[in-house]
Curated annotation (Swiss-Prot):
The GLUE domain (GRAM-like ubiquitin-binding in EAP45) mediates binding to ubiquitin and phosphoinosides. The lineage of its organism: Eukaryota, Metazoa, Chordata, Craniata, Vertebrata. Component of a complex at least composed of ELL, SNF8/EAP30, VPS25/EAP20 and VPS36/EAP45. Component of the endosomal sorting complex required for transport II (ESCRT-II), composed of SNF8, VPS36 and two copies of VPS25. Interacts with VPS25, SNF8, TSG101 and CHMP6. Interacts (via GLUE domain) with ubiquitin. Interacts with RILPL1 (via the C-terminal domain); which recruits ESCRT-II to the endosome membranes. Interacts with ECPAS. It comes from Rattus norvegicus (Rat). This is Vacuolar protein-sorting-associated protein 36. Belongs to the VPS36 family.
Length: 386
């Protein structure tokens, strides 16, 4: 902690903000200190921590002081962390929260997630070392005399340790990749066999394709629909997470919406998405928050809330006039229909069928008969006949 210096938190000339994350706690080695909940900012030149309650409490450490970084997975009751190993503090360091520290590393605990994306961006900055190619004002430089080079400060033991960490990380990534590939090959083999069976039955016209086989076939396709689901661990718990989730939802919902006439209830969407995400289940609250951003991001699907409070997802090209005209035509052909009867005819849920009929009634094309036998809709003859 003695490497940190007090700062205003303002970016210097030629310094660029890379990423920021709320809810980050700073540890001095393994020790908890008073810097509990703050916003961690990564720029091209510094790591900046600002207290969320007291914005005047702001400290920073130059990226040039970092030797290497490593991830620490979350545990039971423990948040995921990034461990930052540091060079020794220069003798002429500017004032900071600590004058001395026995630890050569700090830990950054991410209480609101987002550590995966932050670690990736920090690793990129450490590799690119843009603070060397794009100098900033002298106020950022914590040294006035010559600073030891990176290799000299680390030492042979430090270099060997860093190489060993990289080797372990590479081995882990390779093992996970082969494990995922094996699972994919097993699932792909089953899917190919099933698809051949269905194709042969259709081609030879011998027997009908059973509903169970169709469901199995679609489930394999759906389970492989989201290769890399958006998670809080990757994007944190704020607006960025819901924006990325909204973009992914638009991608996976467009085809199912087209199959279902351009509209689905939010309940159907919730089941469909969580089935595709596998173990990375989505909460109803996150789904609603992401869907609220669909239209603002100009995506091909949008959230719609009916007067009754029912929420649906529909295609941007889905036209209300065509939907009402279709409902009027169907009811006119049958003379009158209940929501259940209309749902069976058009092949949609009773909930959506009722909302479509109510919308047609609201626009004056249908009228209702609400009796002990239930709610029944009729064509509004006052609108269709002179």
């Amino acid at each position: 902690m003695d490497r940190f210096v007090w700062t205003s938190g303002l970016l210097e000339i030629n310094e660029t903000l890379v990423i920021q994350q709320r809810g980050v706690r700073v540890y001095d080695g393994e020790e908890k200190i008073k810097f509990d909940a703050g916003t961690l900012l990564l720029s091209t030149h510094r790591l900046i921590w600002r207290d969320q309650k007291n914005n005047e409490c702001c400290m920073a450490i130059p990226l040039s002081q970092i030797v290497f970084i490593e991830e620490q997975a979350a545990g039971i009751g423990k948040s995921a962390k990034i461990v930052v190993h540091l060079h020794p503090a220069p003798p002429n360091k500017e004032p900071g929260p600590f004058q001395s520290s026995k630890n050569s590393y700090i830990k950054l605990s991410f209480k609101e997630h987002g550590q995966i994306e932050f670690y990736r961006r920090l690793s990129e900055e450490m590799t690119q070392r843009r603070w060397e190619t794009v100098p900033v004002s002298q106020s950022l430089q914590t040294k006035k005399g010559p600073q030891p080079g990176r290799i000299r400060a680390v030492g042979i033991v430090g270099i060997e340790r860093k190489l060993e960490e990289k080797r372990k990380e590479t081995d882990k990534n390779i093992s996970e990749a082969f494990e995922d590939l094996s699972k994919l090959m097993i699932q792909a083999k089953e899917m190919v066999e099933l698809s051949k069976s269905i194709a042969n039955k259709i081609k030879e016209k011998q027997g009908d394709v059973t509903e169970d086989e169709t469901i199995r076939f679609k489930s394999y396709l759906l389970s492989m629909g989201i290769a890399n689901p958006v998670t809080r661990e990757t994007y944190g718990s704020g607006t960025q997470y819901h924006m990325q989730l909204a973009k992914q939802l638009a991608g996976i919902l467009q085809a199912p919406l087209e199959e279902r006439g351009g509209i689905m209830s939010l309940t159907e969407v919730y089941c469909l998405v969580n089935r595709a995400r596998g173990m990375e289940l989505l909460s109803p609250e996150d789904l609603v928050n992401a869907c609220k951003m669909l239209e603002g991001l100009k995506l091909p699907v949008r959230l719609r809330v009916f007067d009754s409070g029912v929420m649906v997802i529909e295609l941007q090209t889905h036209k209300e006039e065509e939907m009402v005209a279709s409902a009027l035509e169907t009811v006119s052909e049958r003379g009158s229909l209940t929501s259940e009867e209309f749902a069976k005819l058009v092949g949609m849920s009773v909930l959506l069928a009722k909302e479509r009929l109510l919308l047609a009634e609201k626009m004056g094309h249908l009228c209702r008969d609400d009796s002990v036998e239930g709610l029944r809709f009729y064509p509004n003859l006052f609108m269709t006949q002179n």
